[in-house]
């Protein structure tokens, strides 16, 4: 059975996911067969495994850092918020039910056996499993029924590293406060602290670290610097507030609409590696005059279309599109580009039909069954945003409940393969000029040749030189992350904790 180590945090967005990614890569570099695990994840960023199951995007990234194929066992329970108090519950990769927060509070303990069974399957196949917690283990209002922090640590006998974010301030208070709110038997599982996102001279922290260690009898095992320009997907939407927009010199300006229920926003990270500045905007005044407007995926298409209307963003997008600004919609954003959206089963809300932006001659109807599959195929259309790309290979994954019908709009992609075998269907749509494009393919910009051709089509339209981008190697990014974190933490002590386990 695999040995275990767990990363918990004092709150959300302290960097648990990226630290787990780093540890996964470090253990892989050291020759171990390693896998990530998070029993329960609440996220709108999702990934589809080869089996067609949904998991959190963070666990897919962590699996990539491990050099293994993502599986539903890495995230057996995924919660996808649909409204402020309701979530769609994904269990072992498949939709289980949609329930309120209060209902889930009662339901969650029933899923503990499912979560532990997934962890045990991972332990049977690997040398090490790195477990990620959620939020904080000191959320005392949730403690009795949580199945993602101390409950998992205790059930699995997993030693815990507690991470805190020093960049936001108050890290020592948050670490000590977390320990104080844990029960005595829970504190026993905390074997070390990781102070994350530090800027400056680490030696200046020594007096505070001495107090922390004296008061809690738990050692600080690392001070990790604030990571900049890392082309690795981030899980928390707080990342959008911190997003700097590019990784080097840029010649294209891309504005991504920050929908209230935005999902899979990391679809566009790769664009920033090829000379584009990627900005997330939520107000009409922030749009400016971009070369491309992107309407991203959303868990709730109809409510987010209503938001676009109420905020004035819809009018602005339509006006700019009519003046020639390129517009791309992905998944829910693709549905929004059409003329009508129908929801006869009230899948998303009580609204059964709503007008879209009308930039594509399409209509979307929501069905009861969700499509979740990896795909591969090629570009079919050859104009505008897809100019010169006909026949270019693409791959990615689909997660949607809508079925989109094309009228005068032109199909954009031909899907030829899924994990089940050969396929033959069309995806996406473009207007005749190719200036407005929609697709259901998540991860499409991970395809380097397509990404480069897509951006160069915009450059040609803009009248600026095309770029022959450098080959982007995400594997090197994982190594870069691992090297920085390895140099910042006491791996000798972490290996000792891993080997000793909980006794």
UniProtKB/Swiss-Prot annotation:
SUPFAM superfamilies given in the database record: Class I glutamine amidotransferase-like, P-loop containing nucleoside triphosphate hydrolases
UniProt keyword Repeat present: no
One GO term (biological process): cobalamin biosynthetic process
UniProt GO MF annotations: ABC-type vitamin B12 transporter activity; catalytic activity
Active site, UniProt feature: 331 (nucleophile), 442
Domain GATase cobBQ-type: 251-450
Membership in a protein family: Belongs to the CobB/CobQ family. CobQ subfamily.
Entry protein name: Cobyric acid synthase
Gene name for this UniProt entry: cobQ
């Amino acid at each position: 059975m695999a040995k275990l180590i767990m990363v918990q945090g004092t709150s959300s967005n302290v960097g648990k996911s990226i630290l787990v990614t780093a540890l996964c890569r470090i253990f892989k570099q050291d020759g171990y067969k390693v896998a990530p695990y998070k029993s329960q994840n609440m996220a709108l960023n999702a990934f589809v495994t080869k089996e067609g199951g949904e998991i959190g995007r963070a666990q897919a990234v962590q699996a990539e850092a491990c050099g293994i194929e993502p599986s539903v066992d890495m995230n057996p329970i995924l919660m996808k918020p649909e409204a402020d108090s309701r979530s769609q519950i994904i269990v072992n990769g498949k939709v289980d039910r949609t329930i309120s927060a209060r209902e889930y509070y009662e339901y969650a303990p029933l899923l503990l056996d499912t979560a532990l069974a997934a962890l045990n399957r991972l332990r049977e196949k690997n040398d090490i499993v790195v477990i990620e917690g959620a939020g904080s283990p000191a959320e005392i209002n949730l403690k009795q029924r949580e199945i993602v922090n101390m409950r998992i640590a205790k059930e699995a006998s997993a030693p815990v590293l507690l991470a805190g974010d020093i960049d936001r301030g108050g890290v020592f208070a948050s670490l000590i406060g977390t320990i104080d709110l844990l029960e005595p038997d829970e504190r026993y599982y905390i074997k070390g602290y990781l102070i994350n996102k530090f800027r400056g001279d680490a030696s200046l922290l020594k007096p505070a670290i001495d107090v922390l260690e004296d008061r809690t009898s738990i050692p600080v095992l690392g001070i990790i610097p604030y990571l900049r320009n890392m082309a690795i997907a981030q899980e928390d939407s707080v990342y959008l507030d911190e997003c700097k927009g590019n990784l080097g010199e840029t010649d294209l300006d891309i504005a991504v609409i920050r929908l209230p229920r935005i999902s899979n926003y990391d679809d566009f990270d790769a664009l920033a590696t090829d000379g584009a500045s990627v900005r997330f905007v939520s107000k009409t005044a922030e749009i400016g005059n971009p070369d491309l407007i992107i309407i991203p995926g959303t868990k709730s298409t109809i409510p987010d279309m209503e938001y676009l209307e109420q905020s004035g963003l819809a009018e602005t997008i339509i006006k700019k599109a009519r003046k020639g600004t390129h517009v791309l919609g992905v998944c829910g954003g693709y549905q929004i580009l059409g003329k009508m959206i129908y929801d006869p089963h009230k899948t998303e809300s009580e609204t059964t039909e709503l007008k879209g932006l009308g930039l594509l001659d399409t209509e979307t109807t929501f069905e009861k069954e969700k499509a979740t599959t990896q795909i591969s195929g090629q570009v079919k259309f050859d104009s505008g945003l897809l100019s010169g790309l006909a026949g270019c290979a693409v791959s990615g994954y689909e997660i949607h409940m809508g079925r989109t019908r094309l009228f005068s709009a032109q199909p954009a992609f031909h899907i030829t393969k899924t994990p089940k075998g050969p396929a033959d269907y069309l995806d996406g749509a473009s207007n005749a000029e190719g200036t407005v494009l929609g697709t259901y393919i998540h991860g499409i910009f991970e395809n380097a040749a397509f990404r480069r051709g897509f951006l160069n089509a915009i450059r040609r339209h803009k009248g600026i030189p095309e770029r022959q981008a450098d080959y982007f190697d995400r594997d090197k990014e994982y190594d870069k992350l691992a090297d920085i974190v390895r140099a910042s933490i006491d791996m000798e002590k972490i290996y000792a904790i891993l080997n000793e386990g909980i006794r």
